[in-house]
Amino acid sequence: MNLLTEFISNLPAPEAAKIAQIPLRGVQEEVWNALQLQIKSKNYNKDAITDELKISQAHFDKIISELLLKCYKCLCPDEGISLLDFLAKRSFYHKHFYHELKRQIKHAQKTLANEALGQFYKSAMNLIHRNMLIMHKDIEQIKALGEAYVKLAPKEEQKDATLLVKCRLIYTQIDYEFAAGNIKAKEELFTKRLNTELVLHNTSNEEIVYEYFLTRIYFFHGLEQFYNVLKIVDEATLALQRFDTALKRTFIKKLLFKKSEALYYMSRFDKKKVS
């Protein structure tokens, strides 16, 4: 099944109805109609379409790519990070995300100045981190985007950029072990890494301060050491007090949620012990 067929097959009805209105003509329209019939019958056969329309495999693939881009444009008019965000938030479209990421990187490299390109790499890295299911997180891609981001970061932001990327990588590795049920066996390893690889600087901005502590919170949450979660939340809240920004206030609210979450789990475990 090609990317276009997968994309159409997993669209909600309102969006499927919307892309059905895309104006097409010629061979594009013929390929589109043939694909729609195969989707309805759930009988996917590329050769059947190329033979019927008498087009080459390469021509078919080119048309599929063109039609997929038209679907993207219909549902998400803005390209770049907006389109990647649209795909990243839908678990069915992880393959589409990584495929489109390659295209968007090439486009960004040709059109963006260094500062904007660095922010593009950072945003793409964050999309994978925040929106992808763990089974779909490509740590090598996170690493590559992170390295590209750090390389283009202004000199005064190099320390923060480097720390953010390290947080992303360690968080993802913790995520892998947590999902595999191995996190408790790796407690000593990750404790050492958190204490040696993640160094918070006194000049770090509020985003980096938050992400630094969030990585630690996630680790202790995975270990079910909720008393340590509460301790780290308090440390993070104190560290953020020197800032007076809307972003800081957003982070404080998120930390309060983490605190409430930890207290909830602690109360559940206490009840189990009593019973």
PLM regions: where:
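Residue at a conserved register position within TPR or TPR-like alpha-solenoid repeats
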Residues: 177, 220, 263-265
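Structural register within alpha-helical repeat arrays
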Residues: 88, 173, 216, 259-261
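Flexible inter-repeat linkers and adjacent short helices
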Residues: 1-189
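Amphipathic alpha-helical segments of tetratricopeptide repeats
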Residues: 106-110, 150-154, 191-201, 234-245, ...
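Extended alpha-solenoid helical-repeat scaffolds
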Residues: 217-219, 225-226, 239-242, 247-251, ...
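TPR-repeat structural position
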Residues: 98, 226, 269-274
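Alpha-solenoid helical repeat architecture
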Residues: 116-120, 158-165, 203-213, 243-256
